[in-house]
Amino acid sequence: MRAALFPGSFDPITWGHIDLVKRASLIFDKVIVLVANNSNKSYLLSDIERYELTFEVIMSLGWTKIFVDKYDGVILDYALKNNIGFIVRGVRAFHDFEFEFERYVVNNKLNSSIDTVFLPSSDKYLFVRSDLVKELIKNKNFNLSNFIPELVQKKLKSKFIDKLS
């Protein structure tokens, strides 16, 4: 079975993430969406909230080959422990590719048994990113249907509407 890992912070999960997961599931027998923590990032949602929201969204789509997990450690270690041979990374533009390629080189030097597959963003989601969603939320813009699913909008609105007033 060819399994792949699609790691990210998913703060919050966007239509762009969902599109990449769906496309990865066409290539691999199993895709694990891994909600990971990055100590260099500050998050809008807690790690539990990010995991639960990502899980709810993915499960609501009814995809049988896609699973959600969370991990607070080195992504390469998770892949090794779970016998996963591929890491899927989405790239929107050249600067994403440059960053992800550097990450691939480091991972390859640490363990060459795990390969990286780069998937370009679909045109429709080229400018969709979690940072943009967070910026819009902070500016009290909750009409985000082009960026995130309704389930995510409701969660963010209920969590932040009072804090931002």
Swiss-Prot record:
List of residues binding substrate: S9, K41, I75, R89
Compartment(s): Cytoplasm
Gene Ontology cellular-component terms listed: cytoplasm
Gene3D superfamilies, per the entry: HUPs
Domain of life, per lineage: Bacteria
Residues annotated as binding ATP: S9, F10, H17, G90, V91, R92, E100, Y125, L126, F127, V128, R129, S130, D131
UniProt keyword annotations, A-Z: ATP-binding, Coenzyme A biosynthesis, Cytoplasm, Magnesium, Nucleotide-binding, Nucleotidyltransferase, Transferase
GO biological process: coenzyme A biosynthetic process
Subunit architecture: Homohexamer.
Task of the protein: Reversibly transfers an adenylyl group from ATP to 4'-phosphopantetheine, yielding dephospho-CoA (dPCoA) and pyrophosphate.
Descriptive protein name: Phosphopantetheine adenylyltransferase
